[in-house]
A protein has these predicted regions:
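Periodic small-residue-enriched repeat registers in elongated scaffold domains
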Residues: 1-120
Length: 120
């Protein structure tokens, strides 16, 4: 693709302006960036970094270990976190933000309705 760059082992940069680096990384969305081990991006402007992370929403960001950011503009960070709705933010360990603009942080917390905030 145009202006894409892949470096490392088993890496793929298949969208325009994408960058994949590390081991078994895949950057598909336009302008997306996947780095680390087994990371994947699939939408425009998404960024996945760390180990086994996935950023599938437009402008989503997943970082850490086994994290998933699938909502538009969502952010998931830490260990086993999920931000699955638009503008959702999950951070910490085993947290889930599934409401729109929801925020879950800490250990095993869930913010499941729109604009919710869970911490602990």
């Amino acid at each position: 693709m145009q202006n894409s760059h892949a470096e490392g082992y088993s890496t793929s940069a298949s969208g325009n302006g994408t960058h994949a680096e590390g081991y078994d990384t895949n950057a598909n969305g336009k302008g997306s960036h996947a780095e680390g081990i087994e990371t994947r991006t699939t939408n425009e402007g998404s960024h996945a970094e760390g180990y086994s992370t996935e950023a599938t929403g437009n402008a989503a960001h997943a970082e850490g270990y086994d994290t998933n950011a699938s909502g538009k503009g969502s952010h998931s960070e830490g260990i086993e976190t999920k931000a699955t709705n638009n503008s959702a933010h999950a951070e910490g360990y085993n947290t889930e933000a599934s409401g729109s603009s929801a925020h879950a942080e800490g250990h095993s917390t869930k913010a499941t309705v729109d604009n919710a905030h869970a911490e602990g």
